[in-house]
Amino acid sequence: MSKILVFGHQNPDTDAIASSYAFDYLSQKAFGLDTEVVALGTPNEETAFALDYFGVEAPRVVESAKAQGSEQVILTDHNEFQQSIADIREVEVYGVVDHHRVANFETANPLYMRVEPVGSASSIVYRMFKENGIEVPKAIAGMLLSGLISDTLLLKSPTTHVSDHLVAEELAELAEVNLEDYGMALLKAGTNLASKSEVELIGIDAKTFELNGNAVRVAQVNTVDISEVLERQEAIEAAIKDAMAAEGYSDFVLMITDIVNSNSEILAIGANMDKVEAAFNFTLDNNHAFLAGAVSRKKQVVPQLTESFGA
């Protein structure tokens, strides 16, 4: 019997890596499954900081499940097939642990599926450790905490669930870190954009959404200075246009998020800019506009685009 691969979404962020890493451990300890954690991309700088801090080896990167001899997969931090492994339609989805909308998803067989409207997939996995009476090792606690901090911007994002505060406190204690100090260090590690090429920058944290027949790419970068990113606008737009031509995206929306002041600048290019402007009730000037208080793609960008596109 081949191993069940456990992984997060393409262009993995910290929650994708952390939740899959922890769920792989839980699957073996609590459910007796023969699993292996893998990743659909290399860790970004924020995730690398967490992995290094807690002495965790990055999961190996794969592109196909069948190429690894696997016929079954477990998805964490995503469920939409266009965000998953290349041959997702050719394998059996054994389980899903997620905190996003459910869309473009169907299976031939029954499966384990746990989806909750909380701040991170890591929050759900931690709760499952407790439910099954499995002790959380320090390194796993640290990674789960990192996933929660990353997705909620240290519990400041509107996606933060009331239960996430207690989860963060408990995980910080298990990981033996100060929540605020470690949280800020983690987030700042992810804002080093100067060393990134424009191609890398628009792919750090990007997901594709099928909206009423349109392939809309929504990417996000975190920074402490939006103006520094906009100084590279011409080169960023060139990279975006190349990606659109290569991948067939109808529209590309880049969130440039200020993690200190909790605002974003939206840079958008594509065939449906009228719908993008209507979604956020703003007017793009030189392809970008300010979106006050916006820090969450999941709650403050994708639902608005979905409604505006009539999806």
From Swiss-Prot:
Its main location: cytoplasm. It catalyses: diphosphate + H2O = 2 phosphate + H(+). InterPro entries: DDH_dom, DHH_sf, DHHA2, DHHA2_dom_sf, Mn-dep_inorganic_PyrPase, Oligoribo/pAp-PDE_c-di-AMP_PDE. It is found in: Cytoplasm. Mn(2+) 1 binds at H9, D13, D77. It comes from the Bacteria. SUPFAM superfamilies: DHH phosphoesterases. Its EC number is 3.6.1.1. Transmembrane segments: none annotated. SMART domains: DHHA2. One of its GO terms (cellular component) is cytoplasm. One of its GO terms (molecular function) is manganese ion binding. Belongs to the PPase class C family. This is Probable manganese-dependent inorganic pyrophosphatase. The lineage of its organism: Bacteria, Bacillati, Bacillota, Bacilli, Lactobacillales. The gene is ppaC.
